[in-house]
């Protein structure tokens, strides 16, 4: 066990609501909702899927949880994982994937259901989508179901990626002509996701903005971690880094702390790092992958003090424009870390705050559920979904402070322009 870390301050988020589950969920049980709207889908082990959102009731914004009736999920089924994505333009529509194991007596039967409605006007209607199902029987036990956008010919395509105990990653791509999804060899589009010797517990595919390249990271049950730098145009693996850690890997996340935006002419090549959460070790960040590989390891102090780290998230949770690293544990603690780069000899992550819950934490999402421009932090625990919000008083003060700063900046710029004044008009010589 590492040394105990002391938080710099209290958690700035307040719990706005809690919705109890009828049965527990798991680390793969949370997904986003339709068409970028503020909605979450949470799956429970006993075959139930809840749609969670806020809506205007009697002139007040209130949380609403509704059970969605997805077809072809037997009452005795145990849901393993759920994922959603919006089709890549110019295609339209929301796609929902659910894996489950049906109780078939001595041996459970695993399935993948893919839901998608092709009727114009219903492409984003969850109730309609839930009735339009493709049912695929699996020959392996499923784990994480996720999605990735990939270049196919001259257009972008979003596909499902499903890890299994075979051990392999399976790819499911839409056949537009048949209006259904089909399994295709993963090596055709993701050559870096082959030759696995242990089940992948978490996969993260991160397309690098402004380029045709991506970083793919996977963490396995054996503790094996692999990161690959890939050029999508010619399916070339440019570089691969691997490391062996102790214990199963619960989460890998590729992220960039760089504030600069990449463009097509100036792709961002630096600043990509990797969060790795292990069930037996402290969570770590491997800093600056493209330049240092997995050589520069930064510890998240105290992350091993509260049992296993089960999930992580990299997002700007304190509204300062810089990303923080959140990790949530089986020991019922949510920990928030901030990178401090100076002084150079003590650079690393500091524990900003921690927050305790009443049951183990499984999954997280940072989404704008209320539609007010401020994102809420949704935390899935064994017992239900907690929605954490910023204090509206503090948020409004922050907005006013930044508006005043903008006004002062503009006044200063106008003042400089007035002092310089217009250039004198030159009269031609007579």
UniProtKB/Swiss-Prot annotation:
Its main location: membrane. InterPro entries: Integrin_alpha_N (IPR028994), Kptn (IPR029982). Residues 410-430 are annotated as: Disordered. Keywords: Actin-binding, Cell projection, Lysosome, Membrane. One of its GO terms (cellular component) is stereocilium. It comes from the Eukaryota. Residues 420-430 have a biased composition (Basic and acidic residues). As part of the KICSTOR complex functions in the amino acid-sensing branch of the TORC1 signaling pathway. Recruits, in an amino acid-independent manner, the GATOR1 complex to the lysosomal membranes and allows its interaction with GATOR2 and the RAG GTPases. Functions upstream of the RAG GTPases and is required to negatively regulate mTORC1 signaling in absence of amino acids. In absence of the KICSTOR complex mTORC1 is constitutively localized to the lysosome and activated. The KICSTOR complex is also probably involved in the regulation of mTORC1 by glucose. Part of the KICSTOR complex composed of KPTN, ITFG2, KICS2 and SZT2. SZT2 probably serves as a link between the other three proteins in the KICSTOR complex and mediates the direct interaction with the GATOR1 complex. May associate with F-actin filaments. This is KICSTOR complex protein kaptin. The gene is Kptn.
